[in-house]
Amino acid sequence: MSIIVISGCATGIGAATRKVLEAAGHQIVGIDIRDAEVIADLSTAEGRKQAIADVLAKCSKGMDGLVLCAGLGPQTKVLGNVVSVNYFGATELMDAFLPALKKGHQPAAVVISSVASAHLAFDKNPLALALEAGEEAKARAIVEHAGEQGGNLAYAGSKNALTVAVRKRAAAWGEAGVRLNTIAPGATETPLLQAGLQDPRYGESIAKFVPPMGRRAEPSEMASVIAFLMSPAASYVHGAQIVIDGGIDAVMRPTQF
């Protein structure tokens, strides 16, 4: 039985992924603020440190997979928490867990980015540059003082920087024998999306943002792709970002890919 660690396992895509992987016979070690084997607040350095210690204690012989789903949206009240969870809550965990993954059987990791990751250019984004430099306090300050666009900046900027972080790790992880990929979901029927729809700042634009397929995704549709990426069937998929958005990115950026 393989051991797979999932952050953000209590709701949304993380919960759907847990269901699919457990049904396939995998043992799950979940991380979340509730309803998980490891209870942790990834918005703080202390919470991330404790999460890492608790997971490694449960996976002393190694782990076979890692799925990083924990994330916050643009409507989050404390915008600094968006960049802390979305970026540091993923990069610090993936780096800390690489040695354990190297001990696993056909190990693989999937990080949840977003179709919004393509909305900003990394080299022209002060937030992304601060995140890459590990300057958490500076990154939090940037979004908290960004005015009306702070939420969108925090979300898209953190996902942009996260995708770059994964791609820049592809060489080292490949040499270590651990596959690492991201998925970029579009609008998915999760509590995170519902919170956005109910926010007067974002609700109307989200509601009007309908993919060419005419509907939003279900979490299970993300989970099935994650399960594939974690499986031996994806043995040569590495360093990739898989866009699962019902065609939105193709419509918005047909010549950019």
Swiss-Prot record:
Chain residues that bind NAD(+): G8, C9, A10, T11, G12, I13, D32, D41, L42, G71, Y155, K159
GO cellular component, one term: cytoplasm
Primary location recorded for the protein, binned into one broad class: cytoplasm
CDD domains documented for this protein: 3alpha_HSD_SDR_c
Keywords carried by this UniProt record: Cytoplasm, NAD, Nucleotide-binding, Oxidoreductase
Active-site residues per Swiss-Prot or TrEMBL entry: Y155
GO MF, one example: androsterone dehydrogenase (B-specific) activity
Induction remark: By steroids. Derepression of gene transcription occurs by binding of the steroid inducer molecule to a repressor protein.
Catalytic activity of the protein: a 3alpha-hydroxysteroid + NADP(+) = a 3-oxosteroid + NADPH + H(+); a 3alpha-hydroxysteroid + NAD(+) = a 3-oxosteroid + NADH + H(+)
Binding residues annotated for substrate, in chain numbering: S114
Any matching Pfam family: adh_short
Protein family: Belongs to the short-chain dehydrogenases/reductases (SDR) family.
Further details from the record: This protein is thought to initiate prokaryotic steroid catabolism.
Description of how the protein assembles with itself and partners: Homodimer.
Described purpose of this protein according to its UniProt entry: Catalyzes the reversible interconversion of hydroxy and oxo groups at position 3 of the steroid nucleus. Along with the 3 alpha-hydroxysteroid dehydrogenase and 3-oxo-reductase activities towards a variety of cis or trans fused A/B ring steroids, it also reduces several xenobiotic carbonyl compounds, including a metyrapone-based class of insecticides, to the respective alcohol metabolites. No detectable activity on testosterone, progesterone or 3-oxo-desogestrel.
Protein name stated in the entry: 3-alpha-hydroxysteroid dehydrogenase/carbonyl reductase
